[in-house]
Amino acid sequence: MPAPTIYYIRHGETAWNAEGRFQGSQDIPLNELGRRQAADAGGILADLCAHDGRSESALTFVASPLERARSTMELVRDVLKLPVGDYAVDDRLREIGYGRWEGSTLAQMQASDPEIFAARLRDKWSVSPPDGESYASVQARMSDWYNQLTTDTVAVAHGGTARALMVVLGVETSDSAADLAIEQGAVYVFSEGGLRKYS
């Protein structure tokens, strides 16, 4: 049986994204640009489904429990003319936890915890922020999530979970994925043919 295709969308921009602040588990709403990015992603997904001759309603839809991901999902579904609230929420898709660093910029992180910051620069995948979560642990929960998929799925989540999924599927290594930019307003398609980004 072929592996399910995943249409992966990172949530749209928030005020903290615009300010360079790390959100992690904090529930920051979309800003105006973020809402436009979500609608753009919905349009891209509609075009991909039309090109592939597939019905959007036949896909499974699942989002991170955080508001910025759920709002993005609802805007995507609105563009697709599907009932906006008819999707699943899965806690495994939540963003990497930044612990004490949530709400901070990189400069503030370095100033508050210089030794941990330096260690994380050397090994971002395995070193956790203070009271936070490592990418390795996010990779474990994303592997668990992926391994239970049985149908082609639209997932709306975060940059950190996208990087972890890329490592789970062998598209990137932990070294190459750790600092990879994940675009907002794009659709990342994971399939047996690898990964393609549409924006």
Predicted regions and their residues:
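Generic beta-sheet signal
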Residues: I6, L59, Q148-G160
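Short active-site segment of divalent metal-dependent hydrolases/proteases
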Residues: T14, T161-A162
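Active-site signature of alpha/beta-hydrolase-fold catalytic machinery across serine-
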Residues: L75, A164-V168
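Alpha-helix C-terminal capping segments
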Residues: S143-T151, V189-F190
